[in-house]
């Protein structure tokens, strides 16, 4: 069974984008490629910080995160080469659509004073990156087991080559952009 948002994409979003932008070929219509969820961890925190972040990321995504390591020494940040500095998960396929559905429908509205995300955070190539203040906005995380609040960066990678196409795709998929 396909994800709910994938069927919405094929049944509603594709015809709307094709009509609006006059695409000649179905393969020109933008679509999601992947969603990357990244948690940066302060290397000088107590011992269990990386394990806690990896456990939280596993609960959110259902995938085991990859540990990101530093490439070189940076004395100002008290950072050594090959020291763990974060963890990330790349979601594709049905898992990507399920995570996007939970993000848009339940997690983002739980942010305090949420009025939508800025439509200016596109990178010029049709990808959208935004930060989430802490992991407790997701209902999968149990508040009693949280030792520290940990934010994360979420990147939505699309096949759209332009920001305008990616904005239209995300808007039609229910993404909560702030009004200008």
Each model region followed by its residue ranges:
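Ribosome-associated RNA-binding proteins
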Residues: 1-180
């Amino acid at each position: 069974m396909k994800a709910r948002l994938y069927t919405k994409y094929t049944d509603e979003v594709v015809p709307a984008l094709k009509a609006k932008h006059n695409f000649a070929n179905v393969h020109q219509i933008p679509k999601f490629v992947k969603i990357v969820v990244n948690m940066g961890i302060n290397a000088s925190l107590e011992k269990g910080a990386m394990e806690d972040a990896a456990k939280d990321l596993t609960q959110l995504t259902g995938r085991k995160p990859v540990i990101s390591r530093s490439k070189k020494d940076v004395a100002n940040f008290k950072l050594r080469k090959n020291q763990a500095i974060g963890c990330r998960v790349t979601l594709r396929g049905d898992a990507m659509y399920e995570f996007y559905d939970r993000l848009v429908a339940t997690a983002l509205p739980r942010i305090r004073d949420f009025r939508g995300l800025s439509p200016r955070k596109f990178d010029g190539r049709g990808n959208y990156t935004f930060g989430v203040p802490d992991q407790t906005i997701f209902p999968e995380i149990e508040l009693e087991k949280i030792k520290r609040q940990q934010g994360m960066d979420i990147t939505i990678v699309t096949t759209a080559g332009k920001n305008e196409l990616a904005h239209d795709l995300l808007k039609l998929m229910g993404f909560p952009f702030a009004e200008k």
